[in-house]
């Protein structure tokens, strides 16, 4: 937010200067241009975070497409137990996918934005992605819950739920984004409240209108534990790697400053220091990329081990996924 704060301060100074000089109209135009630049910068950072936020929801298409025919087929055979089992498997698979993605975006929001969008202001874009990461869990779970309700014949209920959630989103954006202390951060907060409300209503409806309702504790507990531990591992690895990279950068800068003390004129000294600073900057960018990718890779391994160790998934669950049988054989389920 440093650049944006400077722009706002410049707008205030321009307005004050215009008032003292009598050029209020010119100052107002300058303030308008500066504020428009700030708003575009804010929306640009938010749009970049949205691009990453939308990726996990696209993975839900395969699950939602398989839930409706599987549940409808079981109900047509009057197999209510089978329909309930398929519904529970769909929710469990979704939780196993959505929880780690949401936790990963929440924990690694800033380094991911720095890796993919280095030109953006990471102090602004990072927290936006982290907040949107929490909304990812609610969106993915809501999509599958809607499919379950539709498979049981309750076609209109998901629409009503979405209308209620949309009202919450509009209310939050209108009132919270306008708060100076919240600003653009109110937009992802609106996503959390909107889709969190939709998911809560969907789960209540599933429990009320569907026979043999799924046991939510059995479905969500193990994915939540595995995701929480995975997030802790990613946070620890990235934190340790960042400290190592900062130590190396500090040593490189000290070496550059030491070389600048040698005789050779002021120009040579400044040149040596400039080369050292560029070396530190390159090391920072490369180090962030390596540390971020390494933390994500270790998090994936930790999560996979925990899912198998906790028995968080079964062969019936994998049957809803593409190549589920091969994955089950690989995991020896």
Language model segments and positions:
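C-terminal transmembrane helix end/exit motif
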Residues: 1, 192-243, 301-319
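Interfacial segments at transmembrane-helix termini and the short loops linking adjacent helices
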Residues: 10-13, 32-44, 105-139, 250-251
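Alpha-helical transmembrane segments of polytopic membrane transporters and translocases
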Residues: 30-32, 42-60, 91-96
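Helix-loop junctions and terminal segments of transmembrane helices
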Residues: 49, 60-79, 84-87, 91, ...
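Hydrophobic alpha-helical transmembrane segments of multipass membrane transporters and ion channels
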Residues: 52, 92-100, 134-138, 225-233
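Short runs within selected transmembrane alpha-helices of multi-pass transporters and secretion channels
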Residues: 61-64, 127-153, 157-177, 184-207, ...
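Short alpha-helical transmembrane segments in multi-pass integral membrane proteins
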Residues: 86-107, 184-209, 224, 301
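Membrane-proximal transmembrane or re-entrant/amphipathic helices at the cytosolic face
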Residues: 211, 238-333
